[in-house]
Structures are given as C-alpha cells and as structure tokens.
Amino acid sequence: MKDKQFAIPKATAKRLSLYYRIFKRFHAEKIERANSKQIAEAIGIDSATVRRDFSYFGELGRRGFGYDVKKLMTFFADLLNDNSITNVMLVGIGNMGHALLHYRFHERNKMKIIMAFDLDDHPEVGTQTPDGIPIYGISQIKDKIKDTDVKTAILTVPSVKSQEVANLLVDAGVKGILSFSPVHLHLPKDVVVQYVDLTSELQTLLYFMRKED
C-alpha cells in the first residue's frame, strides 16, 4: 500500500487490513461504537497497540465515546483502496497457484485475479479456469499487462525462477508483487514486494508451541 498522507511503521501497516476486517464485522453485527479494548480483543493484541496505531491517523475517536464503527470502516476502506476493484495477475499455476485461482478474493474484498501465466508449453495454457480466468503463456506477459494495465502480481513459481520472473514483471510495468517464494527479490526501490513464506510461518508456530510445553 502506498499512501502519501500518513507515514506509519511497517508493523502498523500490516495491521490495517485486520482493523478493516474487524470494523466490517462490527458493522455487519450492527455495532455502532467500539472502544479500543473491544477492537484489541477481536484482533488478539493489547488496547495500547490499537490506540498507538490509530494515533498515526489523527483523531479517529473521542475519549469516553469510542470509535464510530461505520466511520472507521469507511476510513480503512479508503486507506486500503477497497472502494474499487483492483485487478491482479497470477504467475505460476502449480499447486499453490491453483489454490489461489480458486479463491474468490472478490467476494471478500475488492481484489480480482483476471489472468494467469505459466510456461508456454504448460498443458493449461490457452484454457480458462471454471471462473473464466484465462491462462496464458509467459511469452505473452508484456502484451497482456499492457492491454490490461495490471500493476499487481502474485508470484507462485519455483524459487530458482522467482528472480527471473520478477524481473520480467517489473520490465512489463508491475509495481507490486506478492511472492510465495522464500528467495529475497532484488528489484527497483519503487517496486513493493511482500513475502509469504509458509514454511517459515509453520516453523515459528512450532517454536511457540514447544515454548509453551
């Protein structure tokens, strides 16, 4: 996410979508006001963290009144650009890629995978998913990005290919990449990269489980 108005710590930025999700849930449950303790309990953090996070955005609530749920839901929707559809592309249709292709992002948030890519000789190239997402060969990637003006990509290719494919995406105009590869990508500073390392997350979980024994 790129926002020129607010300069916030990375840890706070990572919680923005959680706050948005909670306020959407509160709104659906017809809760009109919520205090920092309620928000903290819903997310699993302490209320001081909530207040500190919110302080970066000015006056979002009033002491003794709490936070207006509808107002904050709208605020975070604007902040996360969730008021309009964001088109996304996926590169790599292995097991993880297939799982993501079948995940209906647009039914939960306003993000939509509109096309996918793999090696030109992949058997699924030239076909569509049951939801109508076309699958193209990697050699078409520049033309397709130019036609659709997609700026965001999900990368689910083997680690040994991740840098090569990421370079191709950046050359084609992509400005944001969500990478499922544990390999650190060396890209221009104006390209935003987020990493999802499932193995690392699982190892961290197991560490804390052993710590509790």
Curated annotation (Swiss-Prot):
**What phenotype is described for loss of this gene?**
Expression of aldehyde-alcohol dehydrogenase adhE at both the mRNA and protein levels is significantly increased.
User: What's a GO biological-process term for it?
Assistant: negative regulation of DNA-templated transcription
Residues annotated to bind DNA: 18-57
Q: Cite the GO molecular-function annotations of the record.
A: DNA binding; DNA-binding transcription factor activity
Q: Which Pfam families does the entry mention?
A: CoA_binding, Put_DNA-bind_N
Which residues of this UniProt protein bind NAD(+)? G92, I93, G94, N95, M96, G97
Which keywords are on file for this protein?
A: Cytoplasm, DNA-binding, NAD, Repressor, Transcription, Transcription regulation
Cellular component per GO, a single term = cytoplasm
| Localization of this protein | Cytoplasm
Q: Could you say which protein family the record assigns here? A: Belongs to the transcriptional regulatory Rex family.
Task performed by this protein = Modulates transcription in response to changes in cellular NADH/NAD(+) redox state. Binds to the promoter of the aldehyde-alcohol dehydrogenase adhE gene. Functions as a redox-dependent repressor of adhE expression.
Assembly: Homodimer.
Name recorded for this polypeptide:
Redox-sensing transcriptional repressor Rex
